[in-house]
Amino acid sequence: MSRIVNCVKLKREAEGLDFPPYPGELGTRIWQQISKEAWEEWKQIQTRLVNENRLNLADARARKYLQQQMERFLFEDGTVEAQGYVPPSA
């Protein structure tokens, strides 16, 4: 049986994550307040940020930047998009 959470990103009830996707208190907060759908949206944006900005995830500054963008996207109603990204035309 799937968990239902009141997703703060989508502002509605939705299926929750199966486990905390990130370590520590932030991971617990995401698990409690973010839906699978919103987390999948974040993962797509994260991939674009890494690719477009050529981030090296071995660099602590790059990881900190991604964490800040993740918190902004998931909890602060911030729109996060990679500069220079052009969505594919339909």
UniProtKB/Swiss-Prot annotation:
Pfam families: Iron_traffic. GO terms for molecular function: iron ion binding. InterPro entries: Fe_traffick_prot_YggX, Fe_traffick_prot_YggX_sf. One of its GO terms (cellular component) is cytosol. The keyword Iron applies. PANTHER family: FE(2+)-TRAFFICKING PROTEIN-RELATED. This is Probable Fe(2+)-trafficking protein. It comes from Bordetella pertussis (strain Tohama I / ATCC BAA-589 / NCTC 13251).
